Regions:
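C-terminal "cap" of GNAT-fold acetyltransferases
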Residues: 158-194
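Conserved acetyl-CoA pyrophosphate-binding loop and the N-cap/start of the following alpha-helix
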Residues: 106-119
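Conserved catalytic-core motifs of GNAT/GCN5-like acyltransferases
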Residues: 21, 135, 145, 150-173
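Conserved N-terminal entry element of GNAT/NAT acetyltransferase domains
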Residues: 1-29, 190-191
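Acidic/histidine-enriched, beta-strand-rich ligand/metal-binding domains
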Residues: 99, 108, 124-127, 142, ...
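A conserved beta-strand-loop-helix scaffold within acyl/acetyltransferase catalytic domains
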Residues: 22-102
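Conserved GNAT acetyl-CoA-binding A-motif
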Residues: 122-136
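Residue-level recognition of the GNAT/N-acetyltransferase active site
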Residues: 104, 137
C-alpha cells in the first residue's frame, strides 16, 4: 500500500480510483517498488526487467498513476520527453512518449484506461508537447484508436550505440496535442525507443 507521502497534483477520480500525475524525481523508493510490482503483473514476459527497473529504455519525466481506495497502484503510464525529427524538411517536434501504459487485470473493462489516457493527454498538452507518440502491437491498434490515436504509416527510425540508426518494427501511433497534425514523412526518434 502506498500512502499519501508523494508530491502530486490534484487527483482525478474514476470510480474508486484516484488518478494523479507525479514527476519522476518525486517517486520514492517505496513507490518505485509498488510500480515495479504492478508492471510485473501487467507485463509477465518482461518480469526480469521490471523486477529491477520501473522504466523501459528511457527514463520518464513524469507518470500518471491510478491508486485504489486501499492505496495500491492499479494503473500506470510513464511519460518520456523527446525531440524527434519528422519528414524531408527535418521538422523538429517535441513529443511525449507513452511508455508501459497498463491497468491491472481486475480493473480492466471499467473505463479506467480511457480516463487514464485522457489525464495523460491533458497533462501532455498542459506541458506544451506538440504530440503524443506510442508504440504497440497490432492487437492494441484498435484499443488506442478508440482513444483517438492514429496509426502512423511512414517509417520510424531509432538510434542506439550498438546498431546506429535502424528501422523500428511494430506499430507507431500519433495523437495531436499542441500541433494539429504530424508533418508527412519518416520519423527519426533521435535516440532509442522508450
Amino acid at each position: 500500500m502506498i500512502h499519501d507521502c508523494i508530491k502530486t497534483q490534484m487527483a482525478v477520480k474514476h470510480n474508486d480510483i484516484s488518478l494523479f500525475v507525479i514527476n519522476e524525481e518525486d517517486i520514492s523508493s517505496q513507490l518505485d517498488r509498488a510500480i515495479r510490482e504492478m508492471l510485473v503483473v501487467c507485463f509477465p514476459a518482461d518480469i526480469e526487467h521490471f523486477q529491477r527497473l520501473s522504466w523501459w529504455r528511457s527514463i520518464a519525466v513524469y507518470r500518471v498513476l491510478g491508486k485504489n481506495d486501499k492505496g495500491s497502484i492499479v494503473s500506470h503510464t510513464a511519460l518520456v520527453e523527446r525531440n524527434i525529427i519528422v519528414g524531408p524538411a527535418l521538422k523538429k517536434m517535441r513529443v511525449v512518449g507513452i511508455q508501459s501504459f497498463c491497468v491491472l487485470p481486475d480493473y480492466r473493462g471499467t473505463g479506467l484506461s480511457n480516463k487514464m489516457m485522457s489525464v495523460v493527454l491533458e497533462e501532455g498538452s498542459r506541458r506544451g508537447f506538440d504530440a503524443g507518440l506510442l508504440f504497440c502491437r497490432e492487437q492494441l491498434l484498435k484499443v488506442y484508436g478508440h482513444m483517438g490515436w492514429s496509426k502512423f504509416d511512414a517509417s520510424v527510425y531509432i538510434t542506439n550505440d550498438k546498431k546506429g540508426k535502424t528501422l523500428m518494427s511494430g506499430f507507431t501511433m500519433f495523437y495531436p496535442l499542441n500541433a494539429r497534425q504530424l508533418p508527412t514523412g519518416d520519423i527519426d526518434l533521435a535516440g532509442n525507443d522508450w
